């Protein structure tokens, strides 16, 4: 299991009458999956758009989606729970035959590949229903480290924007999702909203021929993740966290994702991590003004790793 550290970088001297403390928190994981076994179950769900538009480009897109999904299935580690979802104006479980998850082994991979080979492209696009299908699959493994790949080539035209947002909100904290848009006709903002809220990535796959390698890499990365991490912020009475934003390697605002631990403490979920990762977070604390020469603790920053709280770092 990876070893985690959190370092705080800041200017500890404030101007007179200042009421804001800014700090950069660098969270680093080192050691990687080879350092120990993953705690608990892992889940991989592959969600592919099978709407009518996927039959375009003389069928290249749906063929590429089938091939990429089969490649991802082959990349899933033995013992990992998995499922495949087909998305149109509603979600359909492609594999397994009954709603639920199955463990990856030689037999289930062959069965899943066969089921995926029969997928056809027809229907509309309702991404929110696809996300909710993933959430339902995870009801049988609520504590698992869950990851989904979501692929679409078009816009969310078969449900309202309000329904999509409600589905995204429902899925926050339940699983991590990497979203990919195939071609150039998909809506960037829609997939960015999904990926940002679900602590994943969003990117374009311009050519169907590139999709198989993309799915393999996404799945391989997910298989290396082993820990759920949260940035735990404690502030003394009278001080408040104004924002928490990831600033490297990508830009993400985590402020609205805060989960209350108690009256003075909140957790900001950072998603699942593998070894040898480093991410930077800009935190801003609003404090009462003080007198020149006063020393004050603005916050304690801790990491919560799979439910285990680590020793704190101080924001002064």
Show which residues each predicted segment covers.
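Acidic, polar loop-rich interaction surfaces within structured domains
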Residues: 169-176, 187-302
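Short beta-strand elements
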Residues: 310-316
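Beta-strand elements of well-folded, non-transmembrane domains
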Residues: 10-12, 27-31, 50-52, 235-237, ...
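Exposed acidic/Ser/Thr-rich ligand/metal-binding surfaces
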Residues: 7, 17-230, 290
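Low-complexity, acidic Ser/Thr/Pro/Gly-rich terminal tails and inter-domain linkers that flank the onset
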Residues: 1-16, 24-26, 231-242
């Amino acid at each position: 299991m990876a070893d985690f550290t959190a370092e705080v970088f800041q200017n500890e001297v404030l101007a007179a009458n200042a009421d804001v403390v800014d700090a950069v928190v660098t969270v680093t994981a080192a050691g990687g999956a080879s350092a120990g076994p993953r705690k608990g179950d892992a889940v991989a769900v592959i969600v592919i758009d099978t709407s009518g538009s996927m039959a375009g480009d003389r069928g290249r897109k749906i063929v590429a989606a089938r091939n990429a999904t089969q490649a991802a299935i082959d990349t899933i580690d033995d013992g990992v729970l998995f499922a495949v979802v087909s998305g149109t104006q509603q979600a359909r479980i492609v594999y397994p035959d009954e709603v639920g998850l199955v463990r990856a082994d030689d037999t289930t991979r062959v069965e899943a590949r066969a089921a995926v080979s029969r997928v056809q492209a027809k229907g509309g696009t309702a991404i929110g229903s696809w996300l909710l299908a993933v959430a339902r699959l995870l009801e049988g493994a609520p504590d698992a480290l869950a990851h989904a790949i979501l692929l679409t080539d078009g816009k969310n035209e078969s449900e309202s924007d309000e329904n999509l947002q409600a589905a995204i909100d429902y899925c926050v904290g339940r699983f991590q999702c990497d979203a990919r848009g195939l071609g150039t006709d998909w809506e960037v903002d829609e997939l960015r909203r999904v990926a940002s809220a679900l602590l994943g990535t969003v990117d374009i796959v311009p050519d169907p021929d590139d999709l198989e390698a993309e799915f393999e890499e996404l799945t391989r990365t997910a298989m290396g993740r082993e820990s759920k991490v949260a940035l735990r912020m404690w502030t003394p009475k009278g001080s408040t966290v104004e924002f928490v934003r990831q600033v490297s390697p990508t830009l993400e605002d985590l402020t609205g994702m805060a989960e209350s631990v108690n009256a003075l403490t909140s957790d900001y979920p950072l998603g699942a991590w593998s070894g040898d990762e480093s991410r930077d977070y800009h935190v801003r604390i609003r404090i009462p003004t003080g007198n020149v020469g006063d020393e004050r603790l603005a916050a304690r920053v801790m990491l919560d790793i799979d439910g285990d709280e680590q020793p704190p770092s101080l924001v002064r």
